[in-house]
Amino acid sequence: MQGLYIKSYGCQMNVYDSLIIENIIKPLGFSIVNELSEADIVILNTCHIREKAAEKLYSELGRIRKIQETKNLTIVVAGCVAQAEGTEIFTRAPFVDIVVGPQSIHTLPELIVKARKIKKQIINIDFPVISKFDAIAVEEYTKNQKVSAFISVQEGCNKFCSFCVVPYTRGEEYSRTVEAIFKEALILADSGIKEITLIGQNVNAYHGTYKGNEWDLGRLIQHIAKISSIERIYYTTSHPRDMHESLYEAHGIEKKLIPFIHLPVQSGSNKILRKMNRKHTAEEYINIIKTLRKHRSDIAYSSDFIVGFPGETDEDFENTIRLIEEVKFSQAYSFKYSPRPGTPSAEYTSQIPDEIKSQRLTKLQELVHKQQLEFNKKMIGETHPVLFYKKGKFDNQIIGKTPYMQSCYINTENPDLYYNKIVPIKITDAHKNHLTGIIPHTLPV
C-alpha cells in the first residue's frame, strides 16, 4: 500500500471534502498516513477565506518540496486556493503535479492516474454540470465518521458580500435532493452516528427537491429527525437573509435540533453592512434573534465579526459593540479585515490602519470572551446532556459537547464506557472555552 497524506484547512466543508477525497483515492491502493515522510501522495485541501492563505500554501509547499527531492512524491493542491490561484500555482511552485478545485474533487482518481502516467501537470478547476455528489456513491463519503458527522446539503453562495471569495471559489448555490441527503443520514445512523451537522456555505438557503416539490431547511431538519437513532441535529453556516418561518418553527418544535445557531452578522453598523453588501440591517438581525427566542427561549448564539472594514469609523465600531451587548453571544469568531484579491472591497478606499484594527479587535474580543465566560458559568450546578466523542490528553479524561456546543471535560475510571453516548453531566466548573463536570451518582452505569 502507498501512503496518502491529506491536510485540510479552514471550514467544515473542507473537512467533509477531505473525507470524500480519502475514500475515493483509497481504492487506488493507498492508505492514510499521518507523517509527510511516509507519503507517496500529498493533498493540501486549502481555504481562501483569510489573509495570506496563498502565502501559507506556498510556504507549506516549500517544506513538502524538500521531501519530494528525496522520493517520488505526487503533490496535489485542492480546495479554494486552488480554484482562486489556478495555473499561478504551477508558476510559483512548478513541482506541484495537480491543481483541482473544490467542485471537481470527484475527478481526482482519474487525475492522479493520468498525472503519474504522463508525468505532466494537470489542472481541473471547472464548475462541472454533474456535481461531485452525483458522481460519487453516497457510501463513499459517509465512511470514517465516528460520533458526529457532517452532511453537505448545500454548496456555493449567491450573496456576493463585498469581502468574500466564496461565490468565486465555490460557485453559485446548489442544493442536494432530499432523497440523497436522507439516504446519507440513514447510512450514518446505521453506522452508529448520534449527531448530524448539516453544512453549507449558506446552509439556510437550502432549497432541495423531494418528489418534484421544493423543501426548505426547516422541513429537511424535521424529516431527518424522524431517524430514531439520530439524537442531535445542528446546521451551519447561516445567512440572516435566509432565515425563514419553517426554520424558526423547527427550533421551537424539534427537540433534536440543538439550541444553538451560528448566525454571522459581521458588523453592527448599517453603513458598514451596506458596504459589505450584506443585504440586511442591524435592526433586522436583532429581530431575527428575538424571533428565535420566541420559539425557543434557551437558544444560544454565535457570530462572526470583521473589524476595521474599509471606512469603519469609531462610531461604526461602537455600533457593533452595542449589538454584541444586546444579543449576548455564547461564542463568536472575530477577525481584522484583510482584502481578498478579486473582491470588490479590496478596491475600496479608506482602508483602516492595522494599529486601529488591532485595538478594535482587542476590545471586541474582550467583550465576547466576557460574555462567553458568563454564559458558561450559568451552567454550574446544572445537569446537561453531553455527547462524548474523544479522549482527553490526560488519563481517564473524556471530552464531549453540550447541546450549546460547549466542550465539556470529565474524569472517569472507564472513559470508553461513555464514548459515543449522550450522558447527563452535572457541571462543576466553567472556563472561557470549556466546562468541567461529573457523572451524577444516581446515574446507572
Swiss-Prot record:
It comes from the Bacteria. Monomer. [4Fe-4S] cluster 2 binds at C157, C161, C164. Residues 2-117 form the MTTase N-terminal domain. It catalyses: N(6)-dimethylallyladenosine(37) in tRNA + (sulfur carrier)-SH + AH2 + 2 S-adenosyl-L-methionine = 2-methylsulfanyl-N(6)-dimethylallyladenosine(37) in tRNA + (sulfur carrier)-H + 5'-deoxyadenosine + L-methionine + A + S-adenosyl-L-homocysteine + 2 H(+). Its cofactor is [4Fe-4S] cluster. This is tRNA-2-methylthio-N(6)-dimethylallyladenosine synthase. Keywords: 4Fe-4S, Cytoplasm, Iron, Iron-sulfur, Metal-binding, S-adenosyl-L-methionine, Transferase, tRNA processing. One of its GO terms (molecular function) is N6-isopentenyladenosine methylthiotransferase activity. Gene3D superfamilies: Methylthiotransferase, N-terminal domain (3.40.50.12160), tm_1862 like domain (3.80.30.20). Residues 377-441 form the TRAM domain. [4Fe-4S] cluster 1 binds at C11, C47, C80. It comes from Ehrlichia ruminantium (strain Gardel). Transmembrane segments: none annotated. Pfam families: Radical_SAM, TRAM, UPF0004.
